[in-house]
Amino acid sequence: MTKSELIERIVTHQGLLSSKDVELAIKTMLEQMSQCLATGDRIEIRGFGSFSLHYRAPRVGRNPKTGQSVSLEGKFVPHFKPGKELRDRVNEEDEAEA
């Protein structure tokens, strides 16, 4: 699902909000979440999951075209850990489809 598809679904489901209002709310939420992670903070949405940063240590990688070794610097990467309610819901829907 893309951001525009999410906006469409919310507008259709909600009915009271315009697509511009929903678009602004989603863009604002994503921007605030990005800023929060950029400063090293953790985001927790109970029942859904949490976003945090994980550190990837420096390592030696390979250039896939040449096979040459390349030194990769350490970096922080965003990490999402689903909450129990989200995991349970996903597993319920998987079992219903099987």
From Swiss-Prot:
SMART domains: BHL. This is Integration host factor subunit beta. It comes from the Bacteria. Belongs to the bacterial histone-like protein family. It comes from Pseudomonas putida (strain ATCC 700007 / DSM 6899 / JCM 31910 / BCRC 17059 / LMG 24140 / F1). Heterodimer of an alpha and a beta chain. One of its GO terms (cellular component) is cytosol. CDD domains: IHF_B. HAMAP family: IHF_beta. This protein is one of the two subunits of integration host factor, a specific DNA-binding protein that functions in genetic recombination as well as in transcriptional and translational control. PROSITE patterns: HISTONE_LIKE. GO terms for biological process: DNA recombination; regulation of DNA-templated transcription; regulation of translation. Keywords: DNA recombination, DNA-binding, Transcription, Transcription regulation, Translation regulation. SUPFAM superfamilies: IHF-like DNA-binding proteins (SSF47729). GO terms for molecular function: DNA binding; structural constituent of chromatin. The keyword Lipid metabolism does not apply.
